[in-house]
Regions:
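SAM-dependent transferase fold signal centered on methyltransferase-like domains
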Residues: 1-217
Length: 217
């Protein structure tokens, strides 16, 4: 089962941001339907349930998604061996692009190997009226302009390969996600953007709002 220790900081930030979103009311007042796509070890979702305060963890209904049955079996066994602080965990085997559409989601995490773009449209369609998405990208050569053809092909953009290239890459990600959101009468509000070693990661609110989507330039 794949486990990446280099992403431990990313998982920690995810727990902190989820707690902030709950405290600020970004995710409504009832059950929070959260999805950890491309989950592998399932550790990110398990940390949500184990490290949030009990009253927050109890609100989380987490789904972990992976194509590998062995990974999901391992994640479920670990979950059973080390019971969470609250909430529920469900495993779903399949392609994230179809599984995410089975239910509305308040929180979606997408952490692929390479570009996240193949998953964004279906994930955006699944979002509740107010929710949060966290998206990683490891195709940093493209996003920072080192591979300009891949950048244009995947993201339809050009950037300067200078000291601000990683910042530019995160802006390219957000611009693409904003356009996808607008196609589904939604708008995004950036919350956190991070360049961490081998990957770029952006976190943003997703709001159902035709009027705000119309302001896209």
């Amino acid at each position: 089962v794949f486990y990446n220790p280099a992403m431990s900081g990313s998982r920690t930030r995810s727990v902190l941001l989820l707690r902030h979103a709950l405290e600020e009311g970004f995710l409504g007042e009832g059950t929070v339907y959260a999805l950890d796509g491309l989950t592998a070890s399932g550790l990110r979702a398990r940390r949500w349930l184990n490290e949030l305060p009990h009253e927050d963890a109890e609100r989380i209904s987490a789904t972990i998604v992976d194509l590998e049955e062995d990974a999901l079996r391992w994640a479920e066994a670990s979950h059973d061996e080390f019971p969470p602080n609250g909430g529920t965990l469900e495993a779903a085997k399949g392609d994230l692009r179809s599984v995410v559409l089975r239910s509305g989601r308040h929180w979606v995490d997408i952490d692929p190997y390479g570009s996240p773009m193949p998953f964004i449209d279906s994930a955006m369609q699944s979002m509740a009226r107010s929710g949060v998405m966290e998206v990683s990208a490891t195709d940093t050569a493209a996003l920072t302009g080192s591979s300009s053809t891949a950048l244009m092909r995947r993201y339809g953009a050009r950037v300067s390969t200078d000291s601000l290239a990683h910042d530019s890459g995160m802006r390219v990600m957000l611009a693409n996600f904003s356009r996808v959101a607008a196609r589904h009468d939604r708008a995004i509000v950036p919350l956190l953007s991070v360049w961490d070693s081998h990957h770029l990661r952006v976190s943003f609110r997703v709001l159902k709002s035709v009027s705000t989507a119309n302001e896209l330039e």
